[in-house]
């Protein structure tokens, strides 16, 4: 038996007190009074941590109560199906008999909506700042100032990008590591097309990398898909669509991505 279970060991050897159940019942009954007293008397950091814990407990309690109510509540629909014929415009409506079925249908729709925007690579390995940036030392006489950083990963900058003056440029994006096109694969059509990159939408490493336009594995980019001839349900041509980078661009020398459809 583990060393920390000495109470259980004692109870197995000698049994419990005769008033064990009564003491347990009273201790549980006092819990609400103890919680109320702590909520009123605690101060400072302990109060913040206590309120955060109670807030999470109340959320879970409300969820359990709501789930219980949905399981029990019945709708006002009749128990037996009606024999009178329905008009044509009402035939497509489902005859849900309880609230749980309606709730389940709503949850399924939400899950489908979430799956619509699921990505091929949900998790990627983190990249440290030492790997991402190279320190560039500056200074006229002594190279002691090291506030500049050179980005060692591929980047994307727009056509209207202009470098800042050298004196004020903190992040340097080398010309040899700038990419304008990506090899995008359509998962349903099974074709790979080289499409121009419009913008970097989300870099999973950091919001700063998104702002700098760094292209790493798992980054969401927007590409120009007008060449594919995709159209919406309304008949309009789709111009920009999102894609996720699936390779390490700095090793392969190109950007490979999968279109999010």
UniProtKB/Swiss-Prot annotation:
Sequence motif: Nuclear localization signal 1, positions: 15-22
Pfam family, one: Ribosomal_S8e
Positions occupied by motif Nuclear localization signal 2: 51-58
Record's compositionally biased regions (Basic and acidic residues): 1-36
Subunit structure: Component of the pre-66S ribosomal particle. Interacts with NOP7 and RRP1. Interacts with RSA4 (via WD repeats).
Family: Belongs to the eukaryotic ribosomal protein eS8 family. Ribosome biogenesis protein NSA2 subfamily.
Protein known as: Ribosome biogenesis protein NSA2
């Amino acid at each position: 038996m583990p060393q920390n279970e000495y109470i259980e060991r004692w109870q197995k050897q000698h049994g419990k007190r005769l008033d064990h159940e009564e003491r347990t019942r009273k201790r549980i009954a006092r819990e609400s009074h103890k919680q109320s007293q702590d909520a009123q008397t605690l101060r400072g950091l302990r109060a913040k941590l206590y309120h955060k814990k109670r807030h999470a407990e109340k959320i879970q309690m409300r969820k359990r109560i709501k789930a219980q109510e949905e399981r029990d509540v019945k709708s006002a629909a009749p128990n037996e199906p009606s024999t009178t014929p329905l008009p044509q415009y009402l035939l497509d409506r489902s005859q849900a008999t309880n609230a749980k079925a309606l709730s389940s249908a709503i949850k399924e729709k939400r899950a489908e909506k979430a799956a619509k925007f699921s990505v091929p690579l949900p998790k990627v390995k983190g990249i440290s700042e030492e790997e991402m940036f190279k320190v560039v030392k500056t200074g006229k006489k002594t190279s002691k100032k090291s506030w500049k950083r050179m980005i060692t990963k591929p980047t994307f900058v727009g056509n209207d990008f202009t470098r800042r003056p050298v004196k004020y440029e903190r992040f340097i994006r080398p010309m040899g590591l700038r990419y304008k096109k990506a090899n995008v694969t359509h998962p349903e059509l099974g074709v790979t097309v080289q499409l121009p990159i419009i913008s970097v939408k989300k870099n999973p490493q950091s919001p700063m990398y998104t702002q700098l336009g760094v292209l790493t594995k798992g980054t969401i980019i927007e590409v120009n898909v007008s060449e594919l001839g995709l159209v919406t349900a309304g008949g309009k041509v789709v111009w920009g669509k999102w894609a996720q980078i699936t390779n390490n661009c700095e090793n392969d020398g190109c950007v490979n991505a999968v279109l999010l459809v």
